[in-house]
C-alpha cells in the first residue's frame, strides 16, 4: 500500500528503475501498475490506502521482515544503479549459499531483498 500514487510512481520509476505499465483513473482511485522488467509477468500494483486502518500498515505490511524479493541477473549493476539513485540499503551486500543479496528499504520503510542466484 502507498499513501500517494504520484509519489510512489516517482520512487519506483526513478529510484528503482521500474517502468510504469498502467495508470488508469477510476472512481476516487487509480489502477497503477509498475514492473521491474518490461515484458515480464512480474508486476507490482500500487494500491493507495483508503482508510485509517490501511494507512497504519503502510511501511509495515510484513511486520518488519523482508516483504518483497527482487531477483536480478546482474547484482552489481543493479545495486550500483540503485545506490546512485539514492536507494537506502540497511546493510552491505553479502554472499550467501544461494547467491549475492542486500536488503534495502523503499520510501515507506518496507524491506526488500535485491538478490542474484549463484546460477545466474
Q: Predicted segments — roles?
A:
Residues 8-13, 82, 109:
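Conserved active-site tyrosine of GNAT-family acetyltransferases
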Amino acid at each position: 500500500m502507498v499513501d500517494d500514487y504520484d509519489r510512489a510512481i516517482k520512487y519506483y520509476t526513478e529510484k528503482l528503475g521500474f517502468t510504469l505499465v498502467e495508470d488508469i483513473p477510476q472512481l476516487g482511485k487509480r489502477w497503477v501498475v509498475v514492473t521491474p522488467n518490461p515484458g515480464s509477468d512480474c508486476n507490482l500494483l500500487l494500491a493507495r490506502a483508503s482508510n485509517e486502518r490501511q494507512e497504519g500498515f503502510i511501511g509495515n505490511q510484513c511486520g518488519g521482515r523482508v516483504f518483497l524479493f527482487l531477483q536480478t541477473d546482474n547484482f552489481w549493476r543493479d545495486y550500483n544503479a540503485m545506490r546512485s539513485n539514492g536507494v537506502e540499503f540497511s546493510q552491505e551486500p553479502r554472499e550467501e549459499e544461494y547467491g549475492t543479496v542486500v536488503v534495502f528499504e523503499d520510501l515507506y520503510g518496507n524491506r526488500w531483498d535485491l538478490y542474484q542466484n549463484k546460477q545466474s
